[in-house]
């Protein structure tokens, strides 16, 4: 099972990725983790990436694809792999295709912007313990206070409505075109084209999980 998981910030990709990894016995491929591992190992690609990052630059798609190909040769990828957060752009998707990285399914978890804003901007955190709440879905017993200590809860900067809206803007501009790219490729039915599956990300996490599993077969 070789797949790409797409969806906006707050769509629930992380939760569903864990279910998929467990069911199919496949690793989640994170480009951030790969970069750190290659730099730590002192590989040629890792050193190139480190030099670029140290200079404040963005690591090129060529280097990332090289790391992806190396990562997929490792033993834990024998049953497949799950990409979450990569590719982010059409050029990255094209580079993966050109490099012959096989993909069986592209799964999009679809959640409307208004729902994502409600989910993320309603989160509250107790900093010392890491306990999380939600003003609508999982409220504390006393508004704004941690259930255990009674201490104040905070809203993280990442969860503020303006920040969430900016992240959604970036997603729509950069990553959402991938939905069309993979949908069109799947529709053409070319050899090597992945199957494209759109799943509603609204509802209980178990229902969403079961919908994904049913689609993957």
Swiss-Prot record:
Subunit structure: Monomer.
Residues engaged in binding ATP: 10-15, 123, 132-133, 203
Binding-site residues, AMP: 31, 36, 57-59, 85-88, 92, 156, 167
Catalysed transformations (reactions): AMP + ATP = 2 ADP
Broad class of where this protein is predominantly found: cytoplasm
Record has ATP-binding as a keyword: yes
Biological processes per GO annotation: AMP salvage
InterPro entries in the cross-refs: Adenyl_kin_sub, Adenylat/UMP-CMP_kin, Adenylat_kinase_CS, Adenylate_kinase_lid-dom, P-loop_NTPase
Protein family (similarity comment): Belongs to the adenylate kinase family.
Region (NMP): 30-59
Species the sequence originates in: Thiobacillus denitrificans (strain ATCC 25259 / T1)
Compartments it resides in: Cytoplasm
Keyword annotations: ATP-binding, Cytoplasm, Kinase, Nucleotide biosynthesis, Nucleotide-binding, Transferase
Domain notes: Consists of three domains, a large central CORE domain and two small peripheral domains, NMPbind and LID, which undergo movements during catalysis. The LID domain closes over the site of phosphoryl transfer upon ATP binding. Assembling and dissambling the active center during each catalytic cycle provides an effective means to prevent ATP hydrolysis.
Protein's UniProt name: Adenylate kinase
UniProt cross-references to Pfam families, sorted A to Z: ADK (PF00406), ADK_lid (PF05191)
EC number: 2.7.4.3
Keyword field contains Ligase: no
NCBIfam families assigned: adk, PRK00279.1-1, PRK00279.1-2, PRK00279.1-3, PRK14527.1
Job description of the protein: Catalyzes the reversible transfer of the terminal phosphate group between ATP and AMP. Plays an important role in cellular energy homeostasis and in adenine nucleotide metabolism.
Pathway: Purine metabolism; AMP biosynthesis via salvage pathway; AMP from ADP: step 1/1
Region annotation (LID) ranges: 122-159
Coiled coil: none
């Amino acid at each position: 099972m070789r797949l790409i998981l797409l969806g906006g910030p707050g769509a629930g990709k992380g939760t569903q990725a864990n279910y998929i990894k467990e069911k199919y016995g496949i690793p989640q491929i994170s480009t951030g983790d790969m970069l750190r591992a290659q730099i730590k190992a002192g590989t040629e690609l890792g050193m190139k990436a480190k030099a670029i990052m140290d200079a404040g630059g963005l690591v090129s798609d060529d280097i990332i694809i090289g790391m992806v190909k190396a990562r997929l040769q490792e033993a834990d990828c024998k049953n497949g792999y799950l990409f979450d957060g990569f590719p982010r752009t059409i050029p990255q998707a094209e580079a993966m295709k050109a490099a012959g990285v096989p993909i069986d399914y592209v799964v999009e978890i679809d959640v409307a912007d208004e729902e994502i804003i409600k989910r993320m901007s309603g989160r509250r955190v107790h900093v010392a313990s890491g306990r999380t709440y939600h003003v609508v879905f999982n409220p504390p017993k006393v508004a704004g206070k941690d259930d255990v200590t009674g201490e104040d809860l905070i809203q993280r900067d990442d969860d503020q409505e303006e920040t969430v809206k900016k992240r959604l803007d970036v997603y729509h501009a950069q990553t959402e075109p991938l939905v069309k790219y993979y949908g069109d490729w799947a529709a053409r039915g070319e050899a090597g084209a992945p199957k494209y599956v759109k799943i509603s990300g609204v509802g209980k996490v178990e229902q969403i999980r079961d919908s994904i599993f049913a689609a993957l077969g």
